[in-house]
Amino acid sequence: MKKSFIHQQEEISFVKNTFTQYLIAKLDVVEVQGPILSRVGDGMQDNLSGTENPVSVNVLKIPNATFEVVHSLAKWKRHTLARFGFNEGEGLVVNMKALRPDEDSLDQTHSVYVDQWDWEKVIPDGKRNLAYLKETVETIYKVIRLTELAVEARYDIEAVLPKKITFIHTEELVAKYPDLTPKERENAITKEFGAVFLIGIGGGLPDGKPHDGRAPDYDDWTTETENGYHGLNGDLLVWNDQLGSAFELSSMGIRVDEEALKRQVEMTGDQDRLAFDWHKSLLNGLFPLTIGGGIGQSRMVMFLLRKKHIGEVQTSVWPQEVRDSYDNIL
């Protein structure tokens, strides 16, 4: 049992270390330290889809403030790029750890504990567009494939990802599969192509509903791009044979500028957020234009090591029935 546990841990470390090295080199970012707590009231917390309640923390020696365990570092990263004067084309990546206790379900792919490569880059002049989003997605996908090939060479786990990733807009997808639910559409398109970047998540589709929820103040999901489609963000999905379904590895996007922020908070009824310090800074032009996202560490390890449950590659909390159903839960 001990030998198996140690081998399991070595595999996890190999995937994480290999991916980190490739990501820093190919995406041209520097690794930095990030926070676990966010001060309530400054607008820095990531509200995700807007329904998740963060973990509140009171600090004894800071009695006049309340803090929350971060959901992600989407806003903190952009603030940090501005604070330290990062130039166009430069960026950072954080080994981010977070808690999301309001996950709808604790299952094979969802955990209370979240670990991500949380990255952000300053967009070069004139590149706040769909072409640059796709270029960045292709870079990250290349990192995933290089890591998969390294795992194949070391552990004899056959590489399965296609050489190229397929791009499709959510509007195209609903037209292609009008009778399917969003999750069923993801499964159908990802099974067909193996690896897909689904563009435009957060805005309303022809039926008036979004493909999935997104907060209004980090990704730009409303800007018109091509052929009447909207959104400069999306999810990177791969086909997972272990689960028989599409599997999200990353969510990313070009971030809101002043106009997109005002437009999106009005659409979601969140205009009150514009009173926060972070949002005021953005509206006053104090932040650079950026692109960023999160890449799930445990999900990446789970996929590349062909595990059936995320609890096999991370230590979290699970209902007893989950522990009873899987022998290798950590």
Curated annotation (Swiss-Prot):
It is found in: Cytoplasm. Its main location: cytoplasm. It catalyses: L-aspartate + NH4(+) + ATP = L-asparagine + AMP + diphosphate + H(+). It comes from the Bacteria. GO terms for biological process: L-asparagine biosynthetic process. Its EC number is 6.3.1.1. Coiled coil: none annotated. CDD domains: AsnA. Disulfide bonds: none annotated. One of its GO terms (cellular component) is cytosol. Signal peptide: none annotated. It holds the Pfam family AsnA. Gene3D superfamilies: Bira Bifunctional Protein, Domain 2. Keywords: Amino-acid biosynthesis, Asparagine biosynthesis, ATP-binding, Cytoplasm, Ligase, Nucleotide-binding. InterPro entries: aa-tRNA-synth_II, aa-tRNA-synth_II/BPL/LPL, AsnA. SUPFAM superfamilies: Class II aaRS and biotin synthetases. GO terms for molecular function: aspartate-ammonia ligase activity; ATP binding; catalytic activity, acting on a protein; transferase activity. Belongs to the class-II aminoacyl-tRNA synthetase family. AsnA subfamily. This is Aspartate--ammonia ligase. It comes from Streptococcus pyogenes serotype M6 (strain ATCC BAA-946 / MGAS10394).
